[in-house]
């Protein structure tokens, strides 16, 4: 008997073996899901640090509105992730904070130097750096979602699947919006 595990939207399904199928029926959450949620909380926290700079570094209304949207959605998602971890009796990891594994930064995370450059920039230079860095940051979140869904058994519960899918959709929309803003400012 072939057992087919559906892929995330836009990704192919895959055939899984009997052991994987049995394991999937017994899962409440996976280590990959816990790592994803813990890492995404840290990732979102850096995005909040970036959006906080908008109030003093730009006068563009569209940048302010973008920042407010990102700020609101990321704060709501951080709260949702805290609750997800708490319901499972899992704490936020202190290990690695900005690092995923092997001492490497999580995908899309800004380095201390990039954050310094952003914090010191003003006006149109700030706007450009903010958009470039936030696009990079959002692309990193997409990589994290892809890695979650590539992990065996991860993303199978409806709550984590819905959350990760929403992160994917929101980040893609915001990347499109920011890319258009960046292109518009270059004209």
Language-model segment annotations:
Residues 1-187:
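All-alpha RGS (Regulator of G-protein Signaling) helical domain and cognate RGS-like helical scaffolds
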């Amino acid at each position: 008997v072939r057992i087919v595990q559906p892929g995330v939207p836009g990704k192919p399904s895959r055939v899984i073996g009997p052991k994987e199928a049995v394991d999937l029926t017994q899962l409440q959450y996976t280590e990959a899901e816990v790592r994803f949620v813990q890492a995404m909380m840290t990732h979102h926290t850096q995005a909040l640090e970036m959006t906080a700079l908008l109030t003093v570094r730009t006068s563009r209304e569209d940048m302010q509105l973008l920042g407010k949207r990102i700020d609101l959605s990321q704060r709501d998602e951080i709260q949702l992730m805290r609750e997800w971890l708490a319901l499972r009796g899992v704490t936020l990891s202190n290990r690695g904070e900005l690092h995923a594994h092997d001492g490497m930064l999580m995908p899309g995370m800004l380095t201390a130097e990039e954050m310094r450059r952003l914090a010191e920039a003003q006006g149109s230079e700030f706007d450009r750096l903010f958009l470039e860095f936030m696009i990079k940051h959002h692309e990193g979140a997409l990589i994290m979602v892809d890695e979650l869904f590539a992990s065996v058994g991860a993303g199978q519960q409806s709550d984590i699947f819905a959350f990760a899918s929403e992160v994917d959709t929101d980040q893609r929309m915001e990347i499109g919006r920011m890319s258009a803003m960046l292109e518009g400012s270059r004209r």
